[in-house]
Amino acid sequence: MINIRKTHPLMKIVNNAFIDLPXPSNISSWWNFGSLLGICLILQILTGLFLAMHYTSDTMTAFSSVAHICRDVNYGWIIRYMHANGASMFFICLFMHVGRGLYYGSYTFLETWNVGVILLFATMATAFMGYVLPWGQMSFWGATVITNLLSAIPYIGTDLVEWIWGGFSVDKATLTRFFAFHFILPFVIAALAMVHLLFLHETGSNNPTGISSDADKIPFHPYYTIKDILGAMLLILTLTLLVLFTPDLLGDPDNYTPANPLNTPPHIKPEWYFLFAYAILRSIPNKLGGVLALVLSILILMLVPFLHTSKQRSMMFRPISQCMFWILVADLLTLTWIGGQPVENPYMIIGQLASIMYFLIILVMMPVASTIENNLLKW
């Protein structure tokens, strides 16, 4: 009898994606982050669902409903902090996953890469709206500042902002719709993740060498299932340590003050995973210019496949490109640091230089480095 997993209409889909899938024999731990992102998403949807059972999306009660979850609901505090810190773990995995794609040339799978960039945008939008829900000071002012950026769009800007707000300022209507969107978007992300996998399985995985691995494939199960379980255990361990020992390490103390439209916090800043983009936004004195730079800082990822000038796919055997990549990583860390600092010298000038460097590395230095390497190899 033929195995049921290969014949059953539903089970054969799972089988072809997670069991009998032929995978390269040499993919490293950098290939674990895809499955970790899946785990993060499931965890966020589950914890979010339980939070939504007790949360109220009204300006008068939102803050106290979160306090109620932490104080009165059975294990509410752990659910709340797993959700908040789970978002941080999600973004750590996302940045690692994108970095892996950049380093090993996985962006040459065009459809997979572009769906991935859309996933990144969707996740950032979801996280932003989630940050508004506790209705603390940073929630309110973060929402005000970021939604206000849309007013920089010529002609329709002001109308667009008021349409998103549902009034003339961030208020009850804004909070209610943000809750609605924050609830629905993770399911959109889950659907997009399936499309992402669908496109990936059309081509098969890349590997560290960037060379075709068709001649040497191994089944996904048991080799990569056991490897993914190890990654998952490390992820859950890290998250548990964060939640149980320092749950507020990555949060902002200002968000423990209820939202007050009459009192602006001294330093308005988003969560740590948006600081690099926030630094790029602030480094341009012009409002529209800043908004464009902010969007382009992520959208530029879609250009990367067209800027690939090397005759090799991966950076594994390209030392000059490796240097460029790690300079880019250092630059992003610098931008993250600057995004959390006040707008004054020397931070302003450092932020401006780091922003210029960011675009310069991706648009100019990396393609030039690749061309130099091609010439060194006499290709």
Curated annotation (Swiss-Prot):
One of its GO terms (molecular function) is metal ion binding. It is a multi-pass membrane protein. Heme b b566 binds at H97, H196. A ubiquinone binds at H201. It comes from the Eukaryota. One of its GO terms (biological process) is mitochondrial electron transport, ubiquinol to cytochrome c. GO terms for cellular component: mitochondrial inner membrane; respiratory chain complex III. Heme b b562 binds at H83, H182. Binds 2 heme b groups non-covalently. Gene3D superfamilies: Cytochrome Bc1 Complex, Chain C. Keywords: Electron transport, Heme, Iron, Membrane, Metal-binding, Mitochondrion, Mitochondrion inner membrane, Respiratory chain, Transmembrane, Transmembrane helix, Transport, Ubiquinone. It is found in: Mitochondrion inner membrane. The chain crosses the membrane at residues 33-53, 77-98, 113-133, 178-198, 226-246, 288-308, 320-340, 347-367. Its main location: mitochondrion. Component of the ubiquinol-cytochrome c reductase complex (complex III or cytochrome b-c1 complex) that is part of the mitochondrial respiratory chain. The b-c1 complex mediates electron transfer from ubiquinol to cytochrome c. Contributes to the generation of a proton gradient across the mitochondrial membrane that is then used for ATP synthesis. The cytochrome bc1 complex contains 11 subunits: 3 respiratory subunits (MT-CYB, CYC1 and UQCRFS1), 2 core proteins (UQCRC1 and UQCRC2) and 6 low-molecular weight proteins (UQCRH/QCR6, UQCRB/QCR7, UQCRQ/QCR8, UQCR10/QCR9, UQCR11/QCR10 and a cleavage product of UQCRFS1). This cytochrome bc1 complex then forms a dimer. Heme 1 (or BL or b562) is low-potential and absorbs at about 562 nm, and heme 2 (or BH or b566) is high-potential and absorbs at about 566 nm. PANTHER family: CYTOCHROME B. Belongs to the cytochrome b family. This is Cytochrome b. It comes from Ammotragus lervia (Barbary sheep).
